[in-house]
Amino acid sequence: MNAEIIAVGTEILLGDIVNTNAQFLSKKLAEMGISVYHQSVVGDNGNRLKEELTESFKRSNIVITTGGLGPTKDDLTKEIGAEYFNRKMFLHEESLKNIKNYFKKQGKILNENNEKQAYFPEKSTILPNNFGTAPGCIMEENDKFLIMLPGPPKEIIPMFKDYVIPYLKKFNEGVLISKVLRICGMGESKVVTEINHLIENQTNPTVAPYAKDNEVTLRLTAKAKNEKEALSLIYPLEKEIRDILGNNIYGTDSDTLEGVIGKFLIENNLYIATAESCTGGLLCGRLVNYPGISKCLVEGIVSYSNNSKMNRIGVKKETLNKFGAVSEETAIEMAKGVANSSGADIGISTTGIAGPSGGTYEKPVGLVYIGYYIKGKSFAKKFIFPGDRQSMRNKTVTVALDYLRKNLI
């Protein structure tokens, strides 16, 4: 079975709200083995919605609409659905009763226009709304399914889980299972080059690369009769990719760099401290994202000025005078200094030129040094990251964590 999603609402077209419903629906449909072929947005215009329904049903046998079930005149989704299937509208007494009870519980008076929400196309399966006043419905005809859902996420999510999923499972066989491999230290083009033969020859399972937030993900997806069979298709492919990419793969599914590192530090009773200049606390902040990091994170210092570098973490004045604040030598002394002063096993530092000004020919904007002190061993890495100030800082943090991971785990 193939599906399409149509978001109805001028507010979405204008960018006033973000269409998170499509993301939720696509994920849930994929879990059921239903492929989403197309997504679209139409304003509160009946003719355009009808045109979109016509085109959608040429490609797919399931069309899901979100929005347009409200009480106003421009909420026309159900009426257009009825026109498309040549059906009349009828008053669903139970839905009207539920709407009245909802208003009563809210201490409000039912407006006459809210009764409009209790009207549905004939022969519809009604989907109760336990969190609002707009019930949904499903129309079925000649192996075509039109599923009309409300717009607010707090209403559509429980409605889809409680009513739509059980309904569709009666008609759909098989599951679509995905596993995500998370990669750091390689760009998307490099990853694709290394595993291109797997991507070009894919059928089932499939491999889909995606770059985001200075990392690359590979989504491995298999379709089978059940989850066990799907995973048996994914595992050999995963092993082959791991053999190629090695320790550039840091985790799977919902893993994060900071989570992988934090878990390792806690399990091995290791303590860490950070000293940051150009990243201004972002590095420590990433570590704090991991619940339980208090068991191993001693402190984080933002030593932005030279005085702070000298007085707080013991960077030598001679080092700053000779090499400058942005240098390998300073980065090493920062990492070692924060580890020694805090009693941590590991110190990590950042110092660089985030821009947009302040760069020179020898030390351009984007230059950064990341220093490490790991159980008595000190070293630093030099990088030049293009982009604006914020992207440079974010990239620095991700790379700093990844090099720490590769030197620890």
Swiss-Prot record:
Gene3D superfamilies: 3.30.70.2860, CinA-like, MoaB/Mog-like domain
Annotated signal peptide: none
Family: Belongs to the CinA family.
NCBIfam families to which the protein is assigned, alphabetical: cinA_nterm, molyb_syn, PncC_domain, PRK00549.1
InterPro entries per UniProt: CinA, CinA-like_C, CinA_C, CinA_KH, Competence-induced_CinA, MoaB/Mog-like_dom_sf, MoaB/Mog_dom
Pfam family, one: MoCF_biosynth
Full protein name: Putative competence-damage inducible protein
